[in-house]
Amino acid sequence: MPVLHNRISNDELKAKMLAESEPRTTISFYKYFTIASPQQTRDALYQVFTALDVFGRVYLAHEGINAQISVPQSKVETFRQQLYTFDPALDGVRLNIALEDDGKSFWVLRMKVRDRIVADGIDDPSFDASNVGDYLKAADVNAMLDDPDAVFIDMRNHYEYEVGHFENALEIPADTFREQLPKAVEMLREHADKKIVMYCTGGIRCEKASAWMKHNGFNKVWHIEGGIIEYARRAREQGLPVRFIGKNFVFDERMGERISDEVIAHCHQCGVSCDSHTNCKNDGCHLLFIQCPQCASKFNGCCSEQCCEELALPEEEQRRRRAGRENGNKIFNKSRGRLNSKLSIPDPAE
């Protein structure tokens, strides 16, 4: 029986990827469709992807698939063909190609079965996720941005919105997508007669959010086809003004794609203009924050003097301290509250 998971250390895999001579293409795709046996599908797809030297992160659930991957350039077309023929539901699925790509976005293939491909917290049995809003293409997006009757809603996390968003888009202040959904309904009640335009990175969150808004009585709902990635690509190809301002945060080693020249965020430590995210180098912290080159040098890549001091401790002492911390206070906690607390940043909601 073939091995259906990775057995090599992350350090070895990363070194191997960095030593590759062939360029890679970073691709993301998703599809909401019924998967009867997610584990069986996962195992079969793992073998297909492994044979093509695909790296990345793939989630499968009964409701569909969500993938962010990198593929050797010489195998992209073979990958496309094998994906499209793997299941009829995947035939022709849109592949979002990264806008900025050094080919170093992933170095290992991880495939996981989950309850949902996007954690939404929805437990209403009458909710129909297929009853989505209408798609908007790039030219339509620009027209909507000039329509005083339209309201743009950003369905991404606070750290994504901070470095880039559409002109005058509303941020839904919440730490997770599941928290955003009910809050979006609440916030938009006063705009019930407006045209609601929802967007996210690649389309997967805003597509479900558009269905949720319709489920809650909103009738004029749109979402951007392919999200920010597809919008920017098509706008550039068609010679249209790109109306997204700043950087598009992405969930891989790049942590962002430059969409426009504007830098709308600031270093969380000194306040200079900066939109480069990083994780605190202290393994007991890993706070996601924005850091300029000068502060990166001053704090040795850490978010605070405390973490800088801890990073300088012997490895054994660092491990001892990490063992005594709650998991929720580590890298997986990207909440605005933790960021504000660690770096003494005023809460914009207050």
From Swiss-Prot:
One of its GO terms (biological process) is tRNA modification. The active site is at 200 (cysteine persulfide intermediate). Signal peptide: none annotated. Its EC number is 1.14.-.-. GO terms for molecular function: oxidoreductase activity, acting on paired donors, with incorporation or reduction of molecular oxygen. It comes from the Bacteria. Pfam families: Rhodanese, Rhodanese_C, UPF0176_N. It catalyses: uridine(34) in tRNA + AH2 + O2 = 5-hydroxyuridine(34) in tRNA + A + H2O. Gene3D superfamilies: 3.30.70.100, Rhodanese-like domain. InterPro entries: Rhodanese-like_dom, Rhodanese-like_dom_sf, Rhodanese_C, TrhO, TRHO_N. Keywords: Oxidoreductase, tRNA processing. It is an enzyme of class 1 (oxidoreductase). Residues 319-328 have a biased composition (Basic and acidic residues). Residues 146-240 form the Rhodanese domain. Residues 319-350 are annotated as: Disordered. Catalyzes oxygen-dependent 5-hydroxyuridine (ho5U) modification at position 34 in tRNAs. HAMAP family: TrhO (MF_00469). Belongs to the TrhO family. This is tRNA uridine(34) hydroxylase. The lineage of its organism: Bacteria, Pseudomonadati, Pseudomonadota, Gammaproteobacteria, Enterobacterales.
